[in-house]
Amino acid sequence: MSEVADKVKKIVVEHLGVEESKVTPEASFIDDLGADSLDTVELVMAFEEAFGVEIPEDAAEKISTVKDAVEYIEKQKAA
């Protein structure tokens, strides 16, 4: 698992209060981890702060799984 993936996982565990074992790449924030729409906004803000990236609203709407978040952040950091 990449450094970005580890950090995303840690943020999700802290913000949603879920067990680390449930935070898999395919885990949906809403369907699998019990997040609501406010939780997803807070997660996006936490990702932005933790990684120093900007995630516009249109991109944030497409981030629904742990893998989506990791891929988006890695792409932004590489740019």
UniProtKB/Swiss-Prot annotation:
Q: Where are the transmembrane segments?
A: none
According to UniProt, this protein's pathway is:
Lipid metabolism; fatty acid biosynthesis
Q: Keyword rRNA processing on this protein?
A: no
Main location as per UniProt: cytoplasm
InterPro entries in the cross-refs:
ACP, ACP-like_sf, PP-bd_ACP, Ppantetheine_attach_site
The record's listing under Gene3D superfamilies reads:
ACP-like
Specify the superkingdom: Bacteria
Residue numbers bearing the O-(pantetheine 4'-phosphoryl)serine modification: 37
> One GO MF term, please?
acyl carrier activity
Looking at the Swiss-Prot or TrEMBL record, what is one Pfam family this protein matches? PP-binding
One record GO biological process: lipid A biosynthetic process
**SUPFAM superfamilies linked:** ACP-like
Question: Which NCBIfam families does the UniProt record give?
Answer: acyl_carrier (TIGR00517), PRK00982.1-2 (NF002148), PRK00982.1-3 (NF002149), PRK00982.1-4 (NF002150), PRK00982.1-5 (NF002151)
Name used for this protein in its record: Acyl carrier protein
Give the originating organism. Answer: Granulibacter bethesdensis (strain ATCC BAA-1260 / CGDNIH1)
State the organism's lineage. Bacteria, Pseudomonadati, Pseudomonadota, Alphaproteobacteria, Acetobacterales
The gene for this chain is acpP
